[in-house]
């Protein structure tokens, strides 16, 4: 059985430096796969640069990105 689900892909508009352990740093132009979009504006996702991914860091501010 194959399960398919939709993942939004966003591009970073600005650099962001994490301020808590759950967040991750990213740079302008980075691409992020979004896994959850709660209404508080702090989305969950994964940086699509395996060399810079950090386990346990998945939260980022939605106002720093745009949908592709």
Where are these regions (language model features)?
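Src homology 3 (SH3)-mediated interaction modules
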Residues: 1-68
